[in-house]
Amino acid sequence: MKLASKEAGMIDLFMILGAYLLGGMSTGYYLVKLWRQEDVRNQGSGATGATNAGRVLGKKGFLLTLMGDALKGALAPALSMHFNLSLTTLILCLIAGVAGHIWPLQLGLRGGKGVAPALGGILVVDPMLASAAAGVFLFVLALTRQFTLSGLAAILGAPILSLIMARPFEQSAGLAVLAIFILLAHRKNIREMLNKSSQRRR
């Protein structure tokens, strides 16, 4: 039996809002609070993601944060698929989860960079595309040995791969929005990489 349009719209809105709030549950922030009684945002880069958590907690903290952030990015899209919601709602849940990770309300809009939850969500939405994006990540990592640059390459490549693989417009557009969000979150890193590159040429 089909839900009435208004009721279906409320469910969609609830799922999208829930995805944002879930995204704001920053794994690295809570792990560092638990293990060190410190605010990870006052350490290193100031981000709550896996790379910065790893600076404070070591390899174990990095891996736990990476897995936690990827899982939370996957959860809302997985629930959307379970309840057979529309592709548009599914993609909006993916975007909202990543937005919550980058700009968490409960942490004063100071979160992570968004790569791990984005890749976790993409894995649920389109496993084949996620595999191709992972290939881009590994290729760039092998060339540069830079985790941040490799993650950016994978995320920027995702909407292009989606178009090449003739995926629905909503998916390709949503992945482009994700890429913009993640670029914004990495703007400081990008400036630093450009400055280093410029200094090497001198």
Swiss-Prot record:
The chain crosses the membrane at residues 8-28, 85-105, 122-142, 146-166, 173-190. It is an enzyme of class 2 (transferase). Pathway: Lipid metabolism; phospholipid metabolism. InterPro entries: G3P_acylTferase_PlsY (IPR003811). Keywords: Cell membrane, Lipid biosynthesis, Lipid metabolism, Membrane, Phospholipid biosynthesis, Phospholipid metabolism, Transferase, Transmembrane, Transmembrane helix. GO terms for biological process: phospholipid biosynthetic process. It catalyses: an acyl phosphate + sn-glycerol 3-phosphate = a 1-acyl-sn-glycero-3-phosphate + phosphate. Its main location: membrane. Pfam families: G3P_acyltransf. It is a multi-pass membrane protein. Its EC number is 2.3.1.275. Catalyzes the transfer of an acyl group from acyl-phosphate (acyl-PO(4)) to glycerol-3-phosphate (G3P) to form lysophosphatidic acid (LPA). This enzyme utilizes acyl-phosphate as fatty acyl donor, but not acyl-CoA or acyl-ACP. Probably interacts with PlsX. This is Glycerol-3-phosphate acyltransferase 1. It comes from Desulfitobacterium hafniense (strain Y51). The gene is plsY1.
